[in-house]
Amino acid sequence: MNAIPLEHGLAVAGVLFCLGLVGLMVRRNILFVLMSLEIMMNASALAFVVAGSRWAQPDGQVMFILVISLAAAEASIGLAILMQLYRRFHTLDIDAASEMRG
């Protein structure tokens, strides 16, 4: 089976990570921020898998499973926080939710 070259896989992972980072910095909607975090975590998982396949080591796949389980935990906790913020402030805007009310 022919695998993709290491440079191409890491380039795709880098582009995905940068896209997630831009989405994290630009967006103010907490749902899009969570999606950007997921993209960044998946990009790092892709880098682990590509590097592991390059040297024929299973460590990349083990790290992929770890990253996916962390992403699932982050998504469930993040969505629970998102629902509570929406119930309390009636918005998903990060700036509006961060204002202190006395």
Curated annotation (Swiss-Prot):
Chief localization: membrane
Annotated transmembrane regions: 6-26, 30-50, 62-82
Gene3D superfamilies: 1.10.287.3510
Statement: the UniProt record of this protein carries the keyword Membrane: yes
Bilayer topology term: Multi-pass membrane protein
GO cellular component assignments: NADH dehydrogenase complex; plasma membrane
GO molecular function annotation: NADH:ubiquinone reductase (non-electrogenic) activity; quinone binding
Alphabetical keyword list: Cell inner membrane, Cell membrane, Membrane, NAD, Quinone, Translocase, Transmembrane, Transmembrane helix, Transport, Ubiquinone
Enzyme Commission number(s) from the entry: 7.1.1.-
UniProt GO BP: ATP synthesis coupled electron transport
Protein localization: Cell inner membrane
Enzyme class: translocase
Coiled coil regions in record: none
Reactions that this protein is recorded to catalyse: a quinone + NADH + 5 H(+)(in) = a quinol + NAD(+) + 4 H(+)(out)
Assembly with partners or alone: NDH-1 is composed of 13 different subunits. Subunits NuoA, H, J, K, L, M, N constitute the membrane sector of the complex.
Protein function: NDH-1 shuttles electrons from NADH, via FMN and iron-sulfur (Fe-S) centers, to quinones in the respiratory chain. The immediate electron acceptor for the enzyme in this species is believed to be ubiquinone. Couples the redox reaction to proton translocation (for every two electrons transferred, four hydrogen ions are translocated across the cytoplasmic membrane), and thus conserves the redox energy in a proton gradient.
Family: Belongs to the complex I subunit 4L family.
Official protein name in the record: NADH-quinone oxidoreductase subunit K
Gene it is expressed from: nuoK
